[in-house]
Amino acid sequence: GCTQPRRIAATSVSEWVAEELGEYRKLVGSKISFRDKYTTATRIKFMTDGELLEELKNDPFLRKYRGVIVDEAHERNLNIDFLLGYLHTRVAKRKDLKLIITSATIDTEAFSSHFHRAPVVTIEGRTYPVEITYSPPPGDENEISYLEHCIDVTAEICATRPPGDILLFLPTEKDIRSCTEILKGRVKTHSILPLFGRLQAKDQRLIFKPHKKPKIVVATNVAETSVTVPGIRYVVDTGLARIGTYHARSRTMRLPIAKISQASCNQRSGRSGRIGPGTCVRLFSEDDFDGREPFTTPEIQRSNLAEVILQMVTLNLGDPRLFPFLDPPRRGAISEGFRTLKELGALDSEHRLTSYGRIMSSMPIDPVISRIIIEANKFDCLAEIVVIAAALAIQDPRMRPAESEHQADEAHRRFADPNSDFMALLNIWNGYHKDNRGFSWSALKKFCLHNYLSFQRMREWLDLHEQLHRIVSRRRKFRFNREPGSYENIHRSLLAGLFRQSGRKKKGSLYQGLSNREFYIFPGSYLHAKSGEWIIGGSFIETSRLFALSAANIEVDWLEKSCTKLCSYSWSNVRYHKKSGRVMADETVALRGLILAASRIVNYPKRNEKNIPSARQVFIREALVDHQLSGRFGFFSKNLATIKKWQESEHKLRRKDIVIDDEAIFDFYARRLPENVFDRSTLKSHVKHHGDSHLCMTEKDILLRLPEDKDLLDFPPHLPAPHEQIALRYRFEPGTPDDGVTALVPEHLVDRTPPELFDWLVPGLIVEKTTYLIK
């Protein structure tokens, strides 16, 4: 078996080897997704590294193979590094398994040491000498940009050097478009051709066709290894590229423009020595080159490791920190990978595979996306989500050529959805299948051409959808819906995996996201100009700003329901609500610092069973002690009447040492009510099943001391008057207007009652009044 980092390479190399073998061509085959081209007679099988990793699930010891060749190992992508680590463990257990690692530019010493001092075989390539010159920008770098300097150097080569094709390396697609336009105006002796990953296939093919004039190919680092540009004599290298780095703490993929390694510089310069002696002009100093890293940081040290860790757990490979990676990833990245998988429900707290995890590991996609598929089965929208999931796992199929941007935008607008970029992807899929009842490659090409879509990516989309559909269909509990899934159900499914890309609008296209980070909706999104208060994004990319590449409007309660276990809940202003008989509170809900709800009135003990003890205290204190309980409760009415009776004695005698205080009343109920009584409803249920005799207060429970009857006789309830008795009210509240004794004179007696009647107080207060008057 021979692995290649890309499908196109696996196909083309297998075809070339088959052609070289002539009559033995049947011994060669290839395996790429569902386009398998091998038979029982196949002895040499070419495949992507991802395909071989998939085979490990059913053939962990690679019994089908006598030897494995890992080609293009210098690319050090996630699959290659994981595969090398895995093969390290298998070579030790299978002495008959031969392993060959091939590459044009790798650290041979590191690879040899990792594989127990494996022999190194060096094969001289068919290359010619390359002259390296260094030409850093003149003056301060703020005075002239790398793009301007690149254009100047290229124009000078065209004017002063012998004719020949030129390859320019620039870091971004935007740079390439700008450079191409400027060079077309300055250099008339050459054909100017762009080359980058999102370029349409027909435009990419132009670099391989003969031209009447020498060509200048303006490329990203795709021309380092992915595409071999023929006929190059000159290379102009800015030494820059966009290098993706996953930031574990913020869970963001960053794509800064950064300096490439020495190995990448040498890979670029080598492109000028394929057909004869060449020249490479590096637009930086030799000291700059000497100070660069010898090799590019392996992808495994700058990527999200969730998918790798999930596969390792599935294959029972043990602790990733002890796995024999050639260059081990950071422990923080491993911890973040585990945390992500636990949040998605793929692993339990002991890092063991869950039922969700087993399903997710069977899908050749990011765990975030496979989790979405599982959720869609619950929401009866599996048909739509498998389409969207397959689209999210590949590059966006929509093309926007520089020369026809307006036409492309108009074509894409046909599929737009004002609320969701994900629905736009679904519309593209449905649009193709609506226009083409039966599948054919010619129909797909026509559809892509008419709608400015990449044929290659649409083909990848169809292939991956078929693969995911087969995997899901094998699951007995998974059912594809026949009726269209609703917008809500589709996006609630998406939230199961994409919740971390949620945000609330601050202003315009700026959103407040989780963990106190801000992000913008990408300008290419249909929601960029007009979006709702709450959105989810498909993925985050950080360039000049942090962008959500795709977006969709959502309701905040969908987000909360999807992330209940991850949300933090806090309560304030806990109080008893007399009308409902419940203990209520103001609730605040936050998801990683993002406030989903604030001051929401909720039934406090019902929100969390941990709230029951404190809710019980509030209920006893405010409903029972503070007399706010309503409804028919015999014990409560009796207790209230008894307490009120003896409190009146306290007011008459002007002392507070007769009736127990509120704390003692609280303790009385707290000792007698069980822990599960925390509101009027639970109290009613308790009384119904257990009676209320144990809740009735006796005078012994209420009184601190029993006052003398003779003392109380000095405080009569009524004042004798000529026509009828006048009621008296006693209050012991010093400093208040009604402190003392108040005569409650009926309105019809006000004019008929002589004032001197009130000169004499009740007997119990005469001594106090006399003392006051003497003073």
Model feature map: region roles:
Residues G1-I372:
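P-loop NTPase motor module signature
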Residues I8, S12, M47, K64, ...:
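Generic recognition of stable, solvent-exposed alpha-helical segments in well-folded globular domains
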Residues F34, V120-I123, G508-L514, F715-H723, ...:
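Short acidic-hydrophobic surface loop/beta-edge motif
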Residues R35, E224, Y526, E733-G735:
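Short polar/acidic secondary-structure junctions
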Residues D59-H74, T238-Y246, S250-R251, L255, ...:
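Extended active-site and interfacial segments that coordinate phosphate-rich ligands
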Residues Y128, F519, Q725-L728:
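Short, isolated positions in well-ordered beta-strands
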Residues I182, K188-T189, P194, V236, ...:
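Second RecA-like catalytic domain
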Residues I471-K505, G524, L559-K565, S570-K775:
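A positional "C-terminalness" feature that preferentially activates on distal terminal regions of long
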